[in-house]
Amino acid sequence: MSDAVTTWLFRIPAVFDGMLADIIRQAGAAQVKRLGREFHLVRMRDAVRPDHASVAGLVRWRLPIDHAWPCHPEKTTSFIEKAAQGVCRRFDGRSIQAILCGPLDPHARHRTPRSLASNLRGRMLQFFPKELSRLHDALTQNPQRPTLFALVGNEGLFCGIATPRECGGFHPGGSVFIRQSDATRISRAGAKLAEALMLLRLD
């Protein structure tokens, strides 16, 4: 049994804030820092997995963090370029099926976090094999193959490699972005139902 400690990124819905300490403790983890409204950096021993039945329904999404750059992207000169190069140096040569980026604050009303994530993914793809750029729909991933996930926000950049099944979802952070300008848009409640149905594809 390994005694090594790994840093994870947990997404725990804000509605469970009153139970936050208990949820993290039951997962066998210790909180390091809160990132935005729903994300939390935690540390846990490698022998413990954050997906057992007691907390799996409360930890909406999780990712082992292999690379982090704490900073304020909008105030960092050439953030996209520096971040993409750093990710390339850290993960070059790793076997992955896709590169996906998302915002640390998926509920933000302004577009900056999503635009930042989209631009960062585009630049990162230029440093990796061309076949990774062929994936345009997160749901076409193999749930059992590793993906490089990256989350970016006012707190910085946080990346890791895991399978969609290990993370608990196909999309970075666990949220499906639906454009409000889309004529076929669905309600927020409908989006939540869609996300729940997608989880069935992880098995």
Question: Where are the model-predicted features located?
Answer:
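SAM-dependent transferase fold signal centered on methyltransferase-like domains
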Residues: 1-203
